[in-house]
Structure formats: C-alpha cells, structure tokens
C-alpha cells in the first residue's frame, strides 16, 4: 500500500488537489489514533535521515534556493538540511517512529521523545552515537553500544532497526519526494502498515476506515499552507 497522489486520484476518480487533501486529513486521523507508542524489553534504537524538502512551496516563499528533486545535498555529513527521524523497535514488534529535529540530535531531544514511552529497566541497543549514553543513564536503561564495524554484541544487535530503515527508504521512494512538513504523516502511515502487515487486505481496509474515523481532524485546507515540520 502506498501510491502517489496522482495515481490515487486516478483510481478513485477525483482531482489531484482533492486526493492530496483527503490523504493528509485521513493520515492526520491515523497519526492521532496511533499516538507515539510504547516500547519495552530489548529495544533497538537508531535514527534515519531524509533530505529537507519544500515540495509544493511556491518559489517566492522558499527559504532557500530550490534543489532539483533527487539531487544530493551539498553539505557533507549530517546538516540542518536533513530531517532526523528517531526510531525504536522492541522484540515484540512495537515501534516508535517520529521526526525529531533538523540535523544532529541531542540527548535532550531523545528524552523529550521517549519520556513515558519506554519501559523502565529496558535494554537499549544502539550504535556508538554519544547522545544515547546520557539518555540511557538518565532513564536507567542497560545500554548495549554496538561498535562501528561490528554487527552485534552477543545476543544484542541493531539489525532489525537497520532492516526497518532500509524498507522505509524504499517505501518512501515511491512517492517521488515528500515535503518535510508532511513527513510525520508518512512515518505514521508506514508504522500503521507495519503493525498490520500480517492481516488480510480486507481486514486492513476495514481497520483503516474504522481507525481513521475514531478520531477527528480539524484540519482545514488553508491549514496545509501554514503547516511546518512537526517535531516532538
């Protein structure tokens, strides 16, 4: 599941603008229904980056010179032109996936995201990023750091979260670029698909309709123009 706005419009028989507005009103509801989530036990955590995008923004309102779609960011390494999405996955399949900040994350941003959403005394498996050290200490988590170049430390690894990132990037690629202000909705859409991936298509369709109507989105068309990237 996951078609472009144009393909969705053609299938349903509506214009592209209506397809766009319907998609994000529905995804606003799905995001509200899912919430941030909760992880517990053995947890793999990492971050994934997407190039900042102003797709759909008029040239006159652009905060920087536009870049051709798919073109590489000029700055090397992690920069403020990248959106950092924090992810955490436990062995039961529970998932947290939220846009966190622009550029490099800090332990305070991690704490802001995971406070109240991560089980006490859990085992946290991460790469060697320093921000996780202070975060794990403050939250009283047993921290297993997987050193660069290694795949695991005993039974602890981050292979599941790395695989999730690979699938996420492949899935995002089908949309031909997503504006950063909507990336939160796409992360929650991906999360929904993952949580219900073993269900039959008929059950998925029923769940999607029901769950998108459990909550109400007060989003108006004019609000889309004013929306900014939503960070935790």
Pin down the residues of each PLM region.
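Residue-level recognition of single "structural anchor" positions
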Residues: 1-232
């Amino acid at each position: 599941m996951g078609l472009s706005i144009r393909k969705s419009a053609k299938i349903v028989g509506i214009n592209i603008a209506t397809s766009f507005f319907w998609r994000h009103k529905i995804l606003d509801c799905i995001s509200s229904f899912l919430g941030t989530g909760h992880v517990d036990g053995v947890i793999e955590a990492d971050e994934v980056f997407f190039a900042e995008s102003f797709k759909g923004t008029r040239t006159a309102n652009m905060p920087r010179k536009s870049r051709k779609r798919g073109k590489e960011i000029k700055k090397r390494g992690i920069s403020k032109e990248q959106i950092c999405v924090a992810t955490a996955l436990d062995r039961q399949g529970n998932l947290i996936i939220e846009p966190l900040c622009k550029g490099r994350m800090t332990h305070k941003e991690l704490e802001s995201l995971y406070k109240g959403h991560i089980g006490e005394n859990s085992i946290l498996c991460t790469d060697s990023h320093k921000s996780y050290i202070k975060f794990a200490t403050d939250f009283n988590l047993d921290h297993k750091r997987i050193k660069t170049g290694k795949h695991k430390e005993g039974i602890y690894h981050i292979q599941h979260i790395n695989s999730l990132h690979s699938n996420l990037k492949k899935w995002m690629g089908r949309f031909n670029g997503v504006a950063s202000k909507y990336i939160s909705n796409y992360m929650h859409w991906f999360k929904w698909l993952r949580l219900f991936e073993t269900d039959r298509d008929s059950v998925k369709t029923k769940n999607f309709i029901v769950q998108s109507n459990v909550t109400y989105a007060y989003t108006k068309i004019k609000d889309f123009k004013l929306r900014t990237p939503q960070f935790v």
